[in-house]
Design a protein with these regions (language model features):
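His/Asp/Glu-enriched, well-ordered alpha-helical/loop segment
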Residues: 246-253, 295-383
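Alpha-helical scaffold segments that flank or form the walls of functional sites
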Residues: 73-144, 168-181
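N-terminal metal-binding scaffold of metallo-dependent hydrolase/deaminase domains
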Residues: 1-43, 55
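C-terminal cap of metal-dependent C-N hydrolases
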Residues: 13, 371-419
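Divalent metal-coordination and catalytic microenvironments
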Residues: 25, 31, 53, 64, ...
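Active-site gating loops and adjacent loop-to-helix segments of metal-dependent hydrolytic enzymes
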Residues: 71-104, 150, 155-165, 223-251, ...
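Metal-coordinating catalytic core of metallo-dependent amide/deamination hydrolases
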Residues: 130-259
């Protein structure tokens, strides 16, 4: 048994912040949470880890990022989506045919994720089976848990980055057969997006998802040019989402990145089927796609999480993704003359942490029975404030100001992976 002491801050529900000053998390030997206490229990036979006045918070969850785009952070930010893909993305991803290169990049990515406080991910790899397995291995070694997908892509790629339909099927099965060795990083089916996959491949993936009980991730309604392209490719689909639905890919736990231009009918279809939005504000602004209607999605009962969308987004640290999401919501607030309420810090943190943990079967906040996923934030080097700060004020400053060095300890799946 272990006991973690510090200022406990969590977001058990949207807009709600729960604070236990100088509290304690009591952990079972397997790293699951036994209880939340206001003080160390008397006669407790446990190792006490005292983090002093630091903040102990549930870790971050990145629900959408492209691992092979990590080398191209900050490149092509003046280009619209399709031009950016053709100019930079496909060429960069093609390099991951080289397993040695993949190992170098993915080892760094895994380290950067965990030391930034992200312990769970829903991640795209490239179409390369061997590189995808290397990615899963490096994430698991670093302590990052979650889902990783080998990309499927049998049309509209580039000469160096495209499979045939049969290659895509064969390599997907080879990848899935090799995934059994991983304990905390699991496979998720990943058709890149409708323009990249033929109807035959999409339908095959839908059947595979049903047969093996696999989740699905892809992209939806990111920008207007993409939506128009889908209409050309799928003239029998009245809306973008139907191209996934007819293939059996539109279902509970499907993660759709962006949803910037999803109209009322598309949002309704998402809610009815349990489809999850991964909101990627930084990427949507960088590539001039727009600003997703997050408040509307939440008000209508949709499931919303946050993603860095590396490398459309240029920020891996999820606290920066949270603050970018808050700023984006303020753009919509101003454009709507105040009718569209902006996200508060508590709400942004919930979306970037608790909502993601809930996707993976956990809960918002520190809940008995959950394996601990937490970060310890030492904010002692922040500029001295003019008055003593409450834990709530310190939490807000941490979300806006903390850097990797402020995260002095990380707990993932019950284990202390950074200390």
């Amino acid at each position: 048994m272990k006991i973690l002491k510090g200022n406990l801050v969590s977001a058990p529900a949207l807009g709600k912040l729960e604070i236990v000053e100088h509290g304690c998390l009591v952990l079972h030997d397997d790293g699951s949470i036994q209880s939340v206490e206001k003080a160390v229990p008397q006669n407790a036979d446990a190792e006490v880890i005292d983090y002093g006045d630091s903040l102990i918070m549930p870790s971050f969850v990145d629900m959408h990022l492209h691992a092979p785009k990590y080398p191209m952070l900050g490149m092509g930010m003046d280009l619209p989506l399709i031009d950016w893909l053709n100019t930079y993305t496909f060429k960069t991803e093609a390099r991951f045919e080289d397993s040695d290169y993949a190992r170098r990049i993915y080892k760094k990515l895994a380290s950067d994720l965990i030391t930034s406080g992200t312990t769970r991910v829903c991640m795209f790899s490239s179409l390369h089976t061997d590189a995808t397995l290397i990615l899963m291995e490096e994430l698991e070694k670093a302590g990052v848990t979650g889902y990783v997908g080998k990309v499927n892509m049998d049309r509209n790629g580039s000469p160096e980055l495209q499979e045939t339909t049969e290659q895509s099927k064969r390599e997907t099965l080879r990848w899935l057969d090799a995934c059994g060795r991983f304990q905390t990083v699991k496979p998720i089916l990943t058709p890149r997006f409708t323009p990249s996959c033929t109807d035959e491949l999409m339908s095959w993936l839908g059947k595979l998802a049903a047969e093996r009980g696999l989740y699905v991730q892809s992209h939806l309604s990111e920008n207007k040019g993409e939506i128009a392209w889908v209409k050309e490719l799928c003239p029998d689909c009245a809306q973008y989402w139907e191209s996934y639905d007819r293939a059996g890919l539109w279902k509970d736990h499907t993660v759709m990145a962006h949803c910037v231009h999803s109209d009322e009918r598309e949002r309704e279809a998402m809610r009815e089927h349990g489809v999850v939005t991964a909101h990627c504000a930084g990427s949507n602004i960088n590539i001039c796609s727009g600003v997703a209607p997050v408040r509307t999605l939440l008000r209508e009962g949709n499931l919303v999480t946050l993603g860095s969308d590396i490398a459309g987004g240029a920020l891996l640290a999820m606290n920066k993704v949270i603050t970018m999401s808050i700023r984006a919501s303020k753009f919509r607030h101003m454009q709507s003359d105040g009718k569209d309420e902006f996200l508060t810090v508590e709400e942004g943190y919930y979306l970037g942490s608790s909502a993601g943990h809930e996707y993976f079967g956990g809960h918002g906040g520190f809940v008995p029975g959950d394996y601990i996923h937490a970060i310890v934030v030492d904010d002692s080097d922040f500029t001295e404030a003019a008055h003593p700060l409450s834990v709530r004020e310190r939490f807000e400053r941490a979300i806006y100001m903390m850097h990797r060095h402020n995260i002095v300890s990380v707990w993932s799946e019950g284990k202390n992976v950074v200390c």
